[in-house]
Amino acid sequence: MARVKGGVVSRKRRKRILKLAKGYYGAKHILFRTAKEQVMNSYYYAYRDRRQKKRDFRKLWITRINAAARMNGLSYSQLMHGLKLADIEVNRKMLADLAVNDAAGFTALADAAKDKLAK
């Protein structure tokens, strides 16, 4: 049986890594070893940050809701508790959108929460 040299396979493997590293800074898109290391790190960052993104958006929504709630004389926790007592099920994403784009609608929800808290 003839000896098989791995040139084609090796070139394909290196080319695949360098293609993934396209646009990276400095030697990280030219040299195979540094490109491979950076691609591995990039996969790690992407995996980690897909999870982090959910936390970051929730924090942003809570911050926006809290700011709008305080303009209506409530804290964030009081608003959420009042909405729960009033059987108003609006998620944080929608509440934050209302707080930014529809102040009157948010005020109506805040007033409903205030009424339930007063009772």
UniProtKB/Swiss-Prot annotation:
Pfam families: Ribosomal_L20. GO terms for molecular function: rRNA binding; structural constituent of ribosome. InterPro entries: Ribosomal_bL20 (IPR005813), RIBOSOMAL_L20_CS (IPR049946), Ribosomal_protein_bL20_C (IPR035566). The keyword Iron does not apply. Gene3D superfamilies: 6.10.160.10, Ribosomal protein L20. GO terms for biological process: ribosomal large subunit assembly; translation. It comes from the Bacteria. Keywords: Ribonucleoprotein, Ribosomal protein, RNA-binding, rRNA-binding. One of its GO terms (cellular component) is ribonucleoprotein complex. PANTHER family: 39S RIBOSOMAL PROTEIN L20 (PTHR10986). Binds directly to 23S ribosomal RNA and is necessary for the in vitro assembly process of the 50S ribosomal subunit. It is not involved in the protein synthesizing functions of that subunit. Belongs to the bacterial ribosomal protein bL20 family. This is Large ribosomal subunit protein bL20. It comes from Streptococcus uberis (strain ATCC BAA-854 / 0140J).
